[in-house]
Amino acid sequence: MLYPTRFDVIVVGGGHAGTEAALAAARAGANTLLLTHNLDTLGAMSCNPSIGGIGKGHLVREVDALGGAMAAATDEAGIQFRILNASKGPAVRATRAQADRVLYKQAIRTRLENQPNLTIFAEACDDLIVEGDKVCGAVTQLGIRFMAEAVVLTAGTFLNGKIHVGLENYTGGRMGDPPSVSLASRLKELKLPQGRLKTGTPPRLDGKTIDFSVMEEQHSDDPLPVFSFLGNAAQHPKQLPCWITETNERTHDIIRSGLDRSPMYTGVIEGVGPRYCPSIEDKIHRFADKNQHNVFLEPEGLTTHEIYPNGVSTSLPFDIQLALVRSIRGMENCHILRPGYAIEYDFYDPRGLKDTLETKAIHGLFFAGQINGTTGYEEAAAQGLLAGINAVRYVRGQSGWCPKRNEAYLGVLVDDLITRGVSDPYRMFTSRAEYRLSLREDNADLRLTEQGRELGLVDDVRWTAFCQKRDAIAAEQERLKSTWVNPKITPADDCIRVLGKAIDHEYNLFELLRRPEVTYTSLLTLPGAGEAQTDPLVVEQLEISAKYQGYIDRQAEEVAKSSSYENTVLPSELDYSSVAGLSNEVRQKLAQHKPQTIGQASRIQGITPAAISLLLIHLKRHNLSQAA
């Protein structure tokens, strides 16, 4: 059957990538269809009940700055909020929240159901309609044909998913959900470059059978952080603690005794797992010198006793899982509600994507999330938003949009994926961003909201709040720079009280704020300093911009130097065999990767500075240079 309505954009999958993609496309005004196999799992947190963390929290704030849903949903569902790296510099501080799974899904579904231009249909997608090298629609299990100009595929771990518990395995997209086999077969026919990856999850525990009194208790920060730039702590539900315990030598002996039945260590699992989120059996093997590993017991929600034991992801046989759990302090009588498991799934080499996340091989087909080799809700959400807005721009015949590496962690994420590919599931860290001093959580809105408004992603409420904040920062910064403190007028006692010492010549307030020991609040107590700003977000930006100005200015100079590379386009039809002086290895890599700019080419492994110089000479000699 051909569905009577033709859509602009179809989004396949209702996870974190799919929901952000559908919301972004619809916000931008496109008639959008979201296909999901189950309405009840829209926005489901398939693994850990948390959002954010180092690098990941930065992505969440960027999604929020562009009008996305993840941060706001977390504010409504978060049952514990903490700032990680709070004692370190602002570039690496990150928000992390435990979320009530049910409340989070409700928050996402409410936004989906109330989003204009968005239609939801509950049917698994079994096929894509492709004519020549262009996608034209999608076909469901029942054979219903939905037509569209663009399709965003966010299949998560469902493509040929296989679940492993010990040496037992069965097909599944996640525990309790069927895999997507027909769609996986169809994608193989399209000759897209693919591979297999693996991820895992720990057993879920019954909190009624755990002795929390012998564990370290961990509470929310005070005052409570918020994730969304429009959020406030009053939105948060009741806050719950987490608990910390640890494995021991007995635990490790139990794990070692089960390795002969581990799918990872017997070669049953072929997919590569996440390097930075290893299973407990992998930790014991890789870090044999450690006699204990922390286990964080995280509540799954306000209305359940279910506990997520962060740190013991495993695919060991169930009898070993039960024994290892019961060997841990406070968990001697613990009941497992659900076993831990590993899941293998198909992914597609992201080097086959443009920076818009459109596939190079099939026009109008976009990939986002774990299908691109990433791991994590936050990475998926960021890709989903980007793919959603670019699908709309593709339909409208507009140029694609992707922030650069110096503009957003989203830009770092995409650039890493499409230039370097993945050998194991990709996770975001602040260390991946060379311009991280400028890419902070606190200024994500100042970096991206104006672009989001131009793209049609930012509504009037967010735009008004942003403009008020932006203008207040600019006005107060200008006032500080034009308000002077003169030692002949300001009493020395006041200078010593605020600055720690007297001053010997005139300074403006902004110059004084650059001093590490001086706070904005104390500075404004100087006679004649004027009325202080009361908005803490404005004050935060004033202090950071003053104290880190020198570093930020130097980073801006580095960006300016590299911008010529980033803005020089490599024609898609360029024949690298015609570029004089390139080695055969370099030619093969460039032909395989098809970088869009000189900047992307420079980050491909094995591409030397000399090769980049030869490319630039070739472009200039043949009048092929053009700006991005």
From Swiss-Prot:
Molecular function GO labels: flavin adenine dinucleotide binding
Species of origin: Dechloromonas aromatica (strain RCB)
SMART domains assigned to the protein according to its UniProt record, in alphabetical order: GIDA_assoc_3
Binding annotation for FAD: G13, G14, G15, H16, A17, G18
PROSITE patterns linked to this entry: GIDA_1, GIDA_2
One Gene Ontology term, aspect cellular component: cytosol
Cofactor: FAD
Family per record: Belongs to the MnmG family.
Protein name: tRNA uridine 5-carboxymethylaminomethyl modification enzyme MnmG
Keywords linked to the UniProt accession: Cytoplasm, FAD, Flavoprotein, NAD, tRNA processing
HAMAP family cross-referenced by the UniProt entry: MnmG_GidA
Function: NAD-binding protein involved in the addition of a carboxymethylaminomethyl (cmnm) group at the wobble position (U34) of certain tRNAs, forming tRNA-cmnm(5)s(2)U34.
Protein's GO biological process: tRNA methylation; tRNA wobble uridine modification
Assembly mode: Homodimer. Heterotetramer of two MnmE and two MnmG subunits.
